[in-house]
Amino acid sequence: MDRDNGPRVRVPEQRTPSIPATADALRFTVLGPVRAWRGSELLSSGSPQQRALLTALLLREGRTATAGELIDAFWGEDPPSQALATIRTYASRLRKILGQDTLVSESGGYAIRTERSALDLTLAQDLAAEAEKARAAGDRCQARTLINKVLGLWDGEALASVPGPYADNQRTRLEEWRLQLTETRLDLDLEVGCHAEAVSELTALTAAHPLRERLRELLMVALYRSGRQAEALAVYADTRRLLAEELGVDPRPELAELQQRILRADEELARPADEPAPAPAPLKPAQLPATVPDFTGRSAFVTELGSRLATAEGSVMAVSAVAGIGGVGKTTLAVHVAHQARRHFPDGQLYVDLQGAGARAAEPETVLGSFLRALGTADSAIPDTLDERAALYRSTLDGRRILILLDNAHDAAQIRPLLPGTPGCAALVTSRVRMVDLAGAHLVDLDVMSPEEALQLFTRIVGAERVGAEREAALDVVAACGFLPLAIRIAASRLAARRTWTVSVLAAKLADERRRLDELQAGDLTVKATFELGYGQLEPAQAHAFRLLGLADGPDISLAAAAALLDLDPHVAEDLLEALVDTSLVESAAPGRYRYHDLVRLYARACAERDEQPPVRRELALSRLLDFYLATAAGVYALERPGERVLDHFTPTEYPGLTFPAREAALDWLFTESSGLLACARQSAAIGMPQRAADLLMAVVDLGESGANSHQFATAAKAVSEAAKAAGVPRAEARARTMLSHVHSVSGRFAEAEAEAMRALDLGRLAQDAVSQGQAPNQRGIIALYENRHDDAEAHLTQALTAFRADGNKPGEAAALCNLSRVHLATGRTATAVRLAEEGVAIYDSDASGLALIGSGRTDPARHVLLEALQIFRESRQQLWHGMTLFRLSELHLTEQEGAQAAAHAEQSLVVLRGIGGDWRRANVLTVLGRALTVIGQTDRAQVCWGEALTVFEELGSPEAEAVRQLLDPAGVG
């Protein structure tokens, strides 16, 4: 079947050369995907909507299309309110591509001014008119040749993937014309005696268009002239039955008359043609390269591709295109699958390396010449032109079952002439480029190996004994190779050839990122050379984007962040990124997100160091990314903490960030971008931007409390503080150390938290930084409160309160008041505790008020306040405070002797705090859980909880240990 619509039309003399191109001439095609060329360069026609506009103008053949006509073409009877503005936008973008003289504005509309021969449709119309003249003059062979050229201009379905009602109508019209031309060509085939060859094509066409009587008439003639009178009559009977059942009509008179002539064995109708001489038995090529003996893994891909090749036995010609980064094992996989599928292709297998990743890809006509010779065609019988060779190639393959492996393809244009024209054969294509424009192809994206597959491949080359002795080092090696098969094979081959090396020696060599690509070479195998082939194919703008994007340390990057780094409009950035994805140099992790393979990132950075000079160009790119992240994160912070003065003290940014309509969307962005944000903070500080890096940490402080990100946050805060210290920027160091103190405190590492807070306060005073002078003593007060140093806690928190008030920081003031409330509660001053807590206005006031109300015996309002806090923390993904509020609720239920509820909340708290909050908090929750369990009579479980809590408190040297020892005393149980 045709890859787009209906059966593939067999045209023995396809396909006609494309429209003649001069160096700068514009050319357009609509008989397939809508495209534009300038000379031999394919131009980007933009979005589907832009292609729809281009289509509407091209099909008017130079006539002006009014705005109203274009709006109708795009949207029909239901245009949007901004339809005219949208049309103008698309027209402006197209004009930039095509030029001011080509896309012109006049009389309130638009037109494309170009030569008639520049459009494939008008060329097809002119050729069809010449064919009619030739036929009328009795030159059937010339008419047939011209019609073949017309049909050869089609490249799949006309106006492929162009949206809009106008395009739909025109697509239907053009497909009808194509079918009429096919009928004309088949009629000419019969007139020149090619009836036997026409039968299979007519059979497929009538199956696809069962009610088209002209096709059935031609099929009856072809069968009759091929000596198949009974089958010809059966076609008529089937036609009569079908028309009666479907439409309630009889066949047209011409068809009935044809049946009578066949019944009479009309000799004039038979018109026997000269029988050609018997052809020699065709050769059976077997060109597949040998499969690698250590082929490993890829079972899902082997099954998927194998099943696709097996379908070639049916009515559809199977084409599968495997794409992936250089070195990922595309050829190895394809050759392995092809060998397994040989039994499905008894007439042979063809293979060619198309050298698509090199500077000079193989020319299709050269490949066709080689294929034709392999299929038994004499040199003297091989035509000169691409179209003639392709036509002969398809004719030679017709009726045979041959597998064609097209390895290392450059693009779909190189592939199309090499594809079979009829079912039975199959093609397997490999390329670094995703063949999205190869209509009908089954696309397979080949990724790197899984860690298990990678280790298996490494083991098969190196040997099980050596790998088994150093399994962890072997895992380090394959991870350093990024699980890329070529890199693993090179590393393993080097190790296998050096018996004195251990696996650990190789792992150590690969640990140095700056040397890693140089280490990954063995003989003529090298990872760097593989990447260089792909890089060399990029356009200058694509190569520039490839280099700069590789500079960012994050595991992936969003489109918006990439646009900031590249200093481009997001639409332009997206086009570049998607082009890089199509070349497999960049991966699309998810819609709108992009990432590099680890080794490709190293290569991109090496290219950037070489080509992005002076170094300030690289620094400016990372500075834009930092500005984007900081500006956006500051907006999230403002939504989370309205009125917070911290943002007023941030370093101004030059590049804007995103804005969010609601808090939920802002938090989604924050947690989605978490790894990139923290990586940017580390990287920016290391290259001389510690102040903005420290500000970024403060803006994303929620990540330090989220559990999944707390370790990354601590690592980033430490890196920023050290970089700020080395650079002599005390304000940045103070803020980074404040954040480091915070995350240490959240994790229960109070000694480290106290040390960082003390240093932060000293630095804040030195730098006269209002932010750290408020937050550092507040942090010290919290630590002292946890350690039951109530006098110190009150002093530090009072100092923080003074600093926050001096700065006009109301949320900070509220936090300090809430924390002071807890100090007063712990020292028995419950009335003051309630008063202080009720003054709190920040998000933490619910938890603090609840704690104070519990201490004063007012449990009902405490329950309400804590449940409100629980909802807030759960929705904002603040896992630490979510877990601690569950802990407070457990304490509340315990005061009411509600043991079951207390135990349930304590157990939930342990689940939420798993991995965050530190051992100290976990031990406190275990202590309360033990108390709750005794209330409901589960004393054995209570003993276990207290035993775990005691171990933690003793390891931390916490004073709570003594209270737990008393609980563990049998006299204290119950």
Swiss-Prot record:
Q: Which residue ranges does the Swiss-Prot or TrEMBL entry mark as DNA-binding?
A: 17-114
Q: Which UniProt keywords apply?
A: Activator, Antibiotic biosynthesis, ATP-binding, DNA-binding, Nucleotide-binding, Phosphoprotein, Pigment, Repeat, TPR repeat, Transcription, Transcription regulation, Two-component regulatory system
Q: Which residues form the NB-ARC domain?
A: 274-591
Gene Ontology molecular function terms on file: ADP binding; ATP binding; DNA binding; pigment binding
Could you name the domain of life of the organism this protein comes from?
A: Bacteria
* GO terms of biological process kind: antibiotic biosynthetic process; phosphorelay signal transduction system; regulation of DNA-templated transcription
Q: How is it modified after translation?
A: Phosphorylated on serines and threonines by AfsK.
Name a Pfam family for this protein. Trans_reg_C
List the PROSITE patterns hit by this protein, alphabetically. OMPR_PHOB
Read off the Gene3D superfamilies from this record: P-loop containing nucleotide triphosphate hydrolases (3.40.50.300), Tetratricopeptide repeat domain (1.25.40.10), Winged helix-like DNA-binding domain superfamily/Winged helix DNA-binding domain (1.10.10.10)
**Where are this protein's TPR repeats?**
814-847, 923-956
Q: What does this protein do?
A: Component of the AfsK/AfsR system involved in the response of aerial mycelium formation to glucose.
What family does this chain come from, according to its entry? Belongs to the AfsR/DnrI/RedD regulatory family.
**Name of the protein this chain belongs to:** Regulatory protein AfsR
Per the UniProt entry, what species is this protein from, by scientific name? Streptomyces griseus
Q: Which gene encodes it?
A: afsR
